[in-house]
Amino acid sequence: MEIFTDDWVDAKEMNYKYPDTFDYPTQIELDNIAIGDSIKISNGLERFWVEVKEKNKIYLIGRVDNELITNEYKLNDLVMFENKNIYDIRTKEDKQFYFKKLLNSQKLKKRK
């Protein structure tokens, strides 16, 4: 399977220039990224989520986890990026919490 690279936005630099608009995780959060976590990156056209599939000291590889509008790559494609490109992190535990919350809200709607 092809692994895409792109001219990813440097989220750390953008956070320095525009702290109210661009988030950047702490070093501890970056160090604790695990396989299965969701990471938000951007190619300058849109920000999107990828699920981490591989991680080493130099780069990460993730699977695109949402539909994209403007890119040559699409849902489920693999992309390679660095820590400096990460805007946000959702851990596996975060995702499970939000999923359970969504399921519970759907159950409540069905009862009404």
Give the predicted meaning of each segment.
Residues 1-9, 13-16, 71-110:
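Intrinsically disordered, low-complexity, charged/polar segments
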Residues 6, 29, 35, 54-55:
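Central antiparallel beta-sheet cores of small beta-barrel/beta-sandwich binding domains
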Residues 16-27:
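Charged, amphipathic alpha-helical segments
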Residues 27-46:
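Short coil-to-beta transition motif at edge beta-strands of beta-rich domains
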Residues 46-57:
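Short beta-strand-centered aromatic/proline hotspots
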Residues 57-58, 84:
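Beta-strand-connecting loop/turn residues
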Residues 58-66:
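Short, solvent-exposed secondary-structure boundary/capping segments
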